[in-house]
């Protein structure tokens, strides 16, 4: 069945939850640890549930305890649950810990949103330098480390976040020192390194382009609170810019999404920041941003591109935004057009011309961030809107409708009506 959000039309305060993009590699890292690992205040997301399923399938005890997740036990099987692995791109992160523990892993090629090419060649070439043999059999990927993992000096051709995380996980349990050059610098990398160090690892340089890791034979248990989600913060900041009002975002360091805040300020929003808070206010007209580009951290995040584009729809002059990371980032453009927006996709660039007023409409989410961007656009539209296929949004936002409602948005989650054929016939009582 389709899941839907119904939006009828933002002031308030929201405490930003833990970052999905940090929680997923952290759950994979728990495979390296002896004892019980507890992750604190984890948002209940579809992708997090998939990660828990992967851990359980590997033979670990992984379960929710309130808003925390505990992981215990050494993995006992090298085969990742194929249906779960195929649902989520981050399933590739579970390979390195299983290789370290068992010397072999079998999986299917990872899934994820269809936003463009997302190859895993950097993951595999780096692992090969650490002693891993790789072969593909159809959709299956089989990795082996017959002599175990060993340290290496690895230079990434592109600062891929996923490849950096994979190699960091492998290096933490490898024999000897590993040097990662050209590494991604995203704060989620630093969060993963902080967790590994908390568990007894030795990681230096995370957050820079060169990371040094001394492998450890054993990592220990700990409790860890993942960092706040800078993309959720970016989403709510863009919602305020699009619809107007005042929003205070707490618990998330503004420097982690500073490029987006700077662009919103250039567009006419008032932005005030503290050590772990930001207040975004838009009372007057919103202006176009000119030409904007995404990039690798610390540039504007690719995940924020559709959200910023949704805010640009409400501006009084033209904007364009180019995503240099993924070639099909703006699958939401068709949905924007349904609201009456004047948009055109040219290659990796979305061009936006001003219109007098967006109008409420029905639009379909085609991916995670694009789906959230449609909700942001709907907040700026006049009248009632409906967003369908919101299961995509559930992969990265916990209680999204409730979060926006607390800011004053008129939004509700609709459950689809059962058709006559779907209604269950009451069973007869048996004597």
Regions found by a protein language model. Give the residues of each.
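Short, structured segments at the rim of ligand-binding sites
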Residues: 1-4, 8-431
């Amino acid at each position: 069945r389709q899941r839907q959000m119904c939006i009828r039309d933002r002031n308030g305060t929201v405490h930003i939850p833990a970052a999905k993009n940090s929680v997923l590699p952290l759950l994979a890292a728990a495979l390296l640890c002896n004892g019980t690992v507890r992750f604190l205040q984890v948002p209940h997301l579809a992708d997090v549930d998939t990660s828990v399923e992967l851990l359980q399938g590997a033979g670990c005890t992984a379960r929710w305890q309130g808003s925390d997740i505990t992981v215990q036990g050494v993995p006992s099987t090298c085969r990742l649950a194929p249906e779960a692995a195929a649902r989520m791109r981050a399933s590739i992160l579970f390979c390195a810990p299983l290789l370290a523990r068992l010397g072999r892993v079998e999986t299917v090629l990872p899934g994820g949103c269809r936003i463009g090419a997302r190859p895993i060649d950097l993951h595999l070439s780096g692992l090969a330098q650490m002693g891993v043999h790789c072969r593909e059999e159809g959709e299956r990927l089989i990795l082996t480390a017959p002599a175990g993992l060993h340290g290496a000096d690895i230079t990434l051709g592109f600062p891929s976040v996923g490849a950096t995380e994979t190699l960091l996980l492998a290096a933490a349990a490898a024999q000897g020192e590993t040097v990662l050059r050209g590494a991604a610098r995203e704060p989620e990398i630093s969060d993963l390194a902080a967790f590994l160090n908390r568990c007894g690892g030795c990681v230096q340089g995370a957050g820079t382009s060169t990371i040094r890791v001394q492998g450890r034979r054993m990592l220990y248990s700990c409790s860890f609170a993942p960092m706040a989600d800078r993309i959720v913060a970016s989403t709510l900041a863009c919602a305020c810019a699009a619809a107007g009002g005042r929003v205070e975002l707490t618990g998330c360091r503004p420097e982690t999404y500073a490029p987006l805040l700077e662009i919103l300020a250039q567009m006419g929003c008032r932005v005030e920041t503290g050590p772990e808070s930001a207040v975004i206010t838009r009372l007057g007209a919103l202006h176009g941003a000119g030409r904007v580009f995404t990039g690798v951290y610390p540039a504007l995040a690719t995940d924020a591109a559709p959200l910023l584009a949704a805010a640009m729809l409400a501006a009084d002059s033209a904007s364009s935004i180019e995503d240099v990371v993924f070639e099909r980032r703006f699958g939401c453009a068709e949905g924007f057009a349904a609201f009456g927006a004047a948009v055109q996709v040219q290659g990796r660039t979305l061009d936006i011309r001003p219109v007098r007023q967006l109008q409420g409409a029905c639009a379909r989410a085609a991916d995670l961030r694009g789906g959230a961007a449609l909700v942001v656009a709907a907040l700026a539209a006049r009248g009632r809107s409906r967003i369908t296929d919101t299961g995509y949004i559930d992969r990265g936002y916990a209680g999204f409708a409730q979060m926006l409602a607390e800011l004053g948005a008129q939004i509700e989650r609709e459950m689809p009506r059962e058709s006559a054929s779907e209604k269950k016939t009451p069973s007869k009582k048996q004597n």
